[in-house]
């Protein structure tokens, strides 16, 4: 997917950066330190969260993704050059981890309410916004779970999602 961006040329000289811009850069530096510290201390080499237990209910998949969901946004705003790749690595690692814990099938929540699925998907949404060429295929595949009746979520006659707990394995 090719994105066309307009050329923008600055025409007003800037003698000194405004205070808000300096504060924003200081915040980005602080956030850069924070995400690196978190990744070093609380995740494994493949991006998984350090979690060695089992899950005892359907709830919880969203919590694994939520710690990373704003990393692509920070990257887009001017965060570290390696932040987007790290966010993707953590999505991959957490997705593998949750698959092993039985929470996902085909990289998607097996079946839970839409509110929690939406929380799980925030990271993917922002990864797709930041790097559509890499992530848009997954977004389309996941959307097909809700528009293709063969997946069991969508009832084309009534034009509704068939049950409150739905996903990649809704039955």
Model-derived segments and their meaning:
Residues 1-171:
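Glycan-recognition and catalytic cores of secretory/periplasmic carbohydrate-active enzymes
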């Amino acid at each position: 997917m090719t994105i066309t961006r307009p050329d923008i040329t600055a025409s007003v000289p800037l003698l000194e950066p405004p205070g808000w811009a300096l504060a924003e850069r200081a915040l980005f530096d602080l956030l850069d330190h924070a995400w690196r510290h978190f990744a070093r201390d609380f995740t494994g080499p493949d991006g998984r969260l350090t979690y060695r237990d089992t899950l005892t209910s359907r709830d919880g998949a969203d919590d694994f993704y939520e710690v990373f969901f704003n990393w692509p946004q920070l990257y887009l705003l001017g965060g570290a050059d390696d932040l987007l790749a790290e966010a993707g690595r953590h999505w991959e690692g957490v997705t593998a981890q949750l698959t092993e814990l039985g929470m996902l099938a085909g990289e998607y929540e097996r079946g839970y309410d839409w509110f929690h699925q939406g929380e799980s998907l925030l990271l993917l949404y922002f990864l797709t916004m930041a790097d559509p060429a890499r992530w848009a295929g997954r977004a389309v595949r996941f959307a097909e779970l809700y528009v293709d009746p063969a997946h069991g979520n969508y009832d084309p006659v009534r034009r509704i999602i068939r049950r409150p707990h739905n996903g990649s394995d809704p039955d």
